[in-house]
Amino acid sequence: MEQKSVNNNGRVIAIITMCFIFAMISFVTNMGAPFGNIWGFKYSWAAMMGNFMNFAAYLFMGIPAGKMIESKGYKKTALIALAVGTIGLMIQYLSSIFGDDIPVFNLSSGAVCLNLIIYLLGAFICGFCVCMLNTVVNPMLNLLGGGGNRGNQLIQIGGTLN
């Protein structure tokens, strides 16, 4: 009886962790909108480029994330994704302190400075993180729920935080 209780407690902790990861996915994905407003003041065309870069990463990371789960497992893939996300956020932070006075190329609306390129690179890397986390969370919640209706219910509960 004691083993069953420990197993259920571990399952509850895993479910709560997966729901927390759903909330992190939402945070990182939606972080581009307020930053985009700031970039929109300097470059009228760049307001949604951060979100675009975030979702463009799915194109490049979807299949490798699935392969990573097959080779490394759910836990290691989630931890790698969190490390990648931290690197992406640090790169985005660097865009606020470096490159504002270094023009990279010119458009008809003016010079595009290095800090925008750094920010977009950070958003792209954060998109890798979000893609890997999505690849982990959805099947993991279904697995924790035992598949079928119960697994889908857990995905819906986690999705409310997304």
Regions found by a protein language model. Give the residues of each.
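Cytosolic juxtamembrane N-terminal segment immediately preceding the first transmembrane helix
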Residues: 1-25, 103-110
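Extracytoplasmic
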Residues: 13-41, 134-138
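C-terminal ends and interior cores of transmembrane alpha-helices
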Residues: 26, 83-112
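Central cavity-lining transmembrane alpha-helices of secondary-active solute carriers
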Residues: 48-69
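Small-residue-rich packing faces within the transmembrane alpha-helices of Major Facilitator Superfamily
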Residues: 59, 79, 86-87
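Intracellular juxtamembrane helix-capping segments at the cytosolic ends
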Residues: 132-146
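Glycine-rich segments within core transmembrane alpha-helices of 12-TM secondary carriers
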Residues: 150-162
